[in-house]
Amino acid sequence: MRAALIGAGQIARQHLSCLKKLPGVELAAICDLSPATAEAAAERYCVRAWFTDHRAMLEKIRPDVVHVTTPPTSHFGPAIDSFNAGAHVIVEKPAAPTIEELETLVQRAREAGRHLVEDHNYLFNQAPQEILRRIEIGEFGAVIHVEVLICLDILGPCGFADPNSPHPALTLAGGAIADFLPHLASLAHLFVGPHRTAQTVWTKRKPSPLPFDEFRAVLDAERGTAALCFSASAQPDAFWLRVYGERMQATANLFETRLTFERPRNVPKPLRPFFSGLEEGKTIRRAALATLLRKFKEPGAYEGLWELLARTYGALADGAAPPLSASHVLEVNRMVEALKPKKRQL
């Protein structure tokens, strides 16, 4: 399959690195508005063709799949043009700044007989996949509640709060935090399904160019409840996923490889914390070593993206549906829409 990429920024590097190693995939072209950026990316990843006009690229290269990794508010045009050129589209999150634009993208994909896949990469990390496996085989029991908490210093030297170089995500409703809502929503959706109601709190604790730096939400969903949080002040950085089931509880830090399970034990009740602590300690030590080792090899922290792309290309090559359907993308983004700050909060 012939692949092309539009938008050769930071996240594009992960897409390009993966594409170069996927069997049966030819990375045919790279496009970026900056000639220097496009040429440098093409040289780094040994891609023969580079462009500054995505329409010219689509017409000349005729790719089977296009990766749209431009800033979030600019996905719509390149995605529509890619569908019109007969390509499937893999788009970075958020796929569109409004639910109306996303619905248009999904409709155009259906009309063209193509697939739209949004990068919900954390769904395909090993930890969520292992939790999901235990749920599917009945070991976990029905999910009662899920918690997703991102602690990340976006006010530090990471680009989000630089007044001299405004980050593209600041144009989204909710600012930089909105760039993380698809991660929170997709994980909640994975374990408790589409939301029915959502209550949110958006606040700002520290002076910065960001409109908000703290976010909390509680959702009632089809299969349970969810609590979603983002904090720019809580430290250390972490990405906690906690899933509570009828027979088991799971805790994972998705910035690491840590995953622990807690279940009722057939020992005297006073001894349960002791045995649980022993098992958890062993698991955390193994995860610490695994987290260190993954820093020295690909895909590193982007294991979920690589797995998503591998499954997607495998499905497309077989003429099958990709692992993330259009209905999934719509349901997650409707949840994201419900999480965005209301006018009274802006």
Pin down the residues of each PLM region.
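C-terminal helix-rich "cap/oligomerization" subdomain common to oxidoreductases
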Residues: 65-67, 297-346
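N-terminal Rossmann-like dinucleotide-binding module
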Residues: 1-45, 346
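Hydrophobic residues in well-ordered beta-strands that form the structural core
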Residues: 51, 91-92, 116-118, 252
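Rossmann-fold dehydrogenase core element
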Residues: 104-122, 142-145
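Predominantly a Rossmann-like dinucleotide-binding segment in NAD(P)-dependent oxidoreductases
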Residues: 123-199, 205-207
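Contiguous beta-strand/loop segments that form the cofactor/metal-binding neighborhood of enzyme cores
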Residues: 179, 185-264, 306-318, 336-338
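Beta-loop-alpha module in the N-terminal Rossmann-like domain of NAD(P)-dependent dehydrogenases
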Residues: 15, 49-108, 304
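Alpha-helical membrane-targeting segments
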Residues: 263-299
